[in-house]
UniProtKB/Swiss-Prot annotation:
Gene Ontology cellular component annotations, sorted alphabetically: nucleus
Classification via InterPro entries: MBD2/MBD3_p55-bd (IPR032343), MeCpG-bd_2/3_C_dom (IPR025884)
Originating gene: MBD3L2B
Top-level taxon: Eukaryota
Compositionally biased region (Basic and acidic residues): 126-137
Pfam families, A to Z: MBD_C, MBDa
Species per Swiss-Prot/TrEMBL record: Homo sapiens
Identification of the protein by name: Methyl-CpG-binding domain protein 3-like 2B
Note: The MBD3L proteins are encoded by strongly repeated regions of the 19p13 chromosome. The exact number of functional copies is unclear, and some of them may represent pseudogenes.
Length: 204
């Protein structure tokens, strides 16, 4: 009889090389999703977001750092907003809507109707019209005025409709002229404040 054939047994796993994930599958999946979102957020934060509320020109928002000289304080989620909504101001405007005496909300007046009611005429125009009305007969209607009410004053006396606002166009020259006026006014104010400060210091 020959020698028995050598049968090879599979080697037992070495404990040092045995690696097993002890994390449950659901928790592992949640961790992978969280890491993917964090990676996308880091990629999106490579460029500074743009602020659209403080100025008409776009400029980058200051990042939040642990530094005392930071000027902008905001939450983490606000840096990804394209155009933040002014909810507080909108609610204040809603609270200021006109209401009737019964408490019911009424529609706001248009700008043209308000101007047609409240726009006063100039003093020179009212004097010229007063002199011209003495020559006219009392039954002749005056253009641009309301008809007189029997037993009461004329509601349109001294009121004239203003020119339409659509005809008044603002040009770049007007903007530059206004900017120069503002700059000169600020310079005059700074000089006056400096002179007042020096005078108070001299009195002390």
């Amino acid at each position: 009889m020959g020698e028995p054939a050598f049968t090879s047994f599979p080697s037992l796993p070495v404990l040092g090389k045995l690696k097993r994930n002890m994390m449950p599958w659901a928790l592992q999946k949640k961790r992978e999703i969280h890491m993917a979102k964090a990676h996308r957020r880091r990629a999106a934060r490579s460029a500074l977001p743009m602020r659209l509320t403080s100025c008409i020109f776009r400029r980058p928002v200051t990042r939040i750092r642990s530094h005392p000289d930071n000027q902008v304080r905001r939450r983490k989620g606000d840096e990804h907003l394209e155009k933040p909504q002014q909810l507080c101001a909108y609610r204040r405007l809603q609270a200021l809507q006109p209401c009737s005496s019964q408490g019911e909300g009424s529609s706001p007046l248009h700008l043209e109707s308000v101007l047609s009611i409240l726009a006063p005429g100039t003093a020179g125009e009212s004097l010229d019209r007063a002199g011209a009305e003495r020559v006219r007969s009392p039954l002749e209607p005056t253009p641009g005025r309301f008809p007189a009410v029997a037993g009461g004053p004329t509601p349109g006396m001294g009121c004239q409709l203003p020119p339409p606002l659509s005809g008044q166009l603002v040009t770049p020259a007007d903007i530059r002229r206004q900017a120069r006026r503002v700059k000169k006014a600020r310079e005059r104010l700074a000089k006056a404040l400096q002179a007042d400060r020096l005078a108070r210091r001299a009195e002390m």
